[in-house]
Regions:
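Peptidoglycan glycan-strand catalytic modules in the bacterial/periplasmic cell-wall system
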Residues: 1-150
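Extended, non-catalytic substrate-recognition/exosite surfaces adjacent to catalytic cores, especially
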Residues: 51-53, 66, 70, 115-117, ...
Length: 210
């Protein structure tokens, strides 16, 4: 999680400050759309292309820096942002593309996912593997330049295949509305699965928490 946050901070296009501003605005938009909206009308309003909506997002994004640490904003952003193929949040993305948990991502996998944030449709590794690999390798080189990897490691990971699943894993979106608690929500679901309660059973059953 911390590694992914560092990636977002340092390699988003446009530099750290511009990237951080973009993170704030995208987090606000995703929060209003995926968490705060209680019906289709509110969800539509959260994503409409209008100047008032954009100004509201910019104002709310600016206010975030006054109430939350940048690390907390990045964590919340990573828990809600779309990585394409119906994967919202870094945990869902790790499982959708690699069938691993976010904390198990290696640098090449993390770089691929972060690279997708530039254009989740245009850099979809299933429809544009060459573009996705080129972007991944750019991120790896940026990681080396920022000191998160040495250049030899970056070159080694850049020479590796994408390593994605044959087809994206389809996941239920049960943790989207958990917002900034997405990691804990996913942990709870995996814990219950280890105890014999699969997600289908959890979603369809009625349980009493005592």
């Amino acid at each position: 999680q911390g590694f992914a946050r560092a990636l977002v901070t340092n390699v988003l296009a446009g530099g750290v400050e511009q990237g951080a501003s973009t993170v704030n605005q995208q987090y606000v938009k995703n929060y209003l759309w995926l968490v705060d909206a209680e019906n289709e009308e509110e969800a539509s309003a959260a994503t409409e292309q209008s100047i008032p909506r954009k100004l509201r997002e910019m104002r709310m994004a600016s206010d975030l820096d006054k109430t939350l640490e940048k690390d907390e904003i990045l964590t919340r952003y990573l828990n809600l942002v779309s990585f394409g193929n119906h994967a919202f949040g870094i945990e869902a993305a790790a499982r959708t593309y690699f069938d691993v948990s976010a904390h198990e991502l290696n640098p090449a996998q993390a770089a691929l996912l972060v690279g997708l944030l530039q254009s989740v449709e245009g850099l979809n590794p299933y429809t544009n593997p060459e573009g996705a690999m080129q972007r991944r390798n750019t991120v790896l080189n940026n990681m080396a330049a920022e000191g998160y990897l040495d250049q030899a490691e970056a070159d080694r990971f850049a020479g590796a295949p994408l390593g994605i699943l044959d087809k994206p894993r389809t996941l239920p979106q049960g943790c989207i509305t958990a917002g900034d608690k997405g990691f804990m929500c996913d942990y709870a679901l995996r814990y219950l699965a280890d105890k014999g309660l699969d997600l289908d059973t959890i979603q369809s059953g009625s349980y009493t928490i005592t």
